[in-house]
Amino acid sequence: MEPLTVVEGLVVPLDRANVDTDAIIPKQFLKSIKRTGFGPNLFDEWRYLDHGEPGKDCRHRPLNPEFVLNQPRYQGANILLARDNFGCGSSREHAVWALVDDGFRVVIAPSFADIFHSNAFKNGLLPIILDEDSVTTLFKDTEATLGYRLRIDLPAQEVTTPEGKVMPFTIDEFRKHCLMEGLDEIGLTLQYRDEIRAYEERRQVEAPWLFEKG
């Protein structure tokens, strides 16, 4: 998992509340568990004018010109601005995989669905909760300003606007540590590889029958 400390980037505003995981990545794309390759199908039913299927080359599909991610001014955005209850609906880690695979490192919203919120941290995506008034202000500024960018400082827990306004956010210290170090659950476990190895060696001495081959 790529470490995340400071993110500076273009913001894209998705002005919809209750965006569920089926909208983020439709169910027909859930067969793969590789974590990669989902980016082109992010928001598939909103992004394209035809019906998407696994294996379909998205480069030749008709784009929906009204969908915000397709607008030229937002190309290359790595910060998604959203509304309340982002990531609700069925539990699918693929929703986070699709966002990360499409280049997003941060999602800012007034609230997130609990499971999506947890999955985001496990996959290197920073979900930032700001109060509704602050989010509404960011929507107005993003839509009014071409190339609107934000600076996200995870160590300082701050969002800074181009005008220099600082918006603090809170985050669990353990999750913050994992994001900054680029540690998923496997990486976190491997930090203790020496202790695990020592325990296994000790168990072989204390309880050798557990290791006997039948």
Swiss-Prot record:
Source organism (scientific name): Nitrosococcus oceani (strain ATCC 19707 / BCRC 17464 / JCM 30415 / NCIMB 11848 / C-107)
Protein keywords: Amino-acid biosynthesis, Branched-chain amino acid biosynthesis, Leucine biosynthesis, Lyase
Pathway this chain belongs to: Amino-acid biosynthesis; L-leucine biosynthesis; L-leucine from 3-methyl-2-oxobutanoate: step 2/4
Record's subunit section: Heterodimer of LeuC and LeuD.
PANTHER family found in the cross-reference section: 3-ISOPROPYLMALATE DEHYDRATASE SMALL SUBUNIT, 3-ISOPROPYLMALATE DEHYDRATASE SMALL SUBUNIT 2-RELATED-RELATED
UniProt-listed InterPro entries: 3-IsopropMal_deHydase_ssu, Aconitase/3IPM_dehydase_swvl, AconitaseA/IPMdHydase_ssu_swvl, IPMI_Swivel, LeuD
Pfam family, one: Aconitase_C
Family: Belongs to the LeuD family. LeuD type 1 subfamily.
Designated name of the protein: 3-isopropylmalate dehydratase small subunit
Signal sequence range: none
Stored CDD domains: IPMI_Swivel (cd01577)
Gene name of the encoded protein: leuD
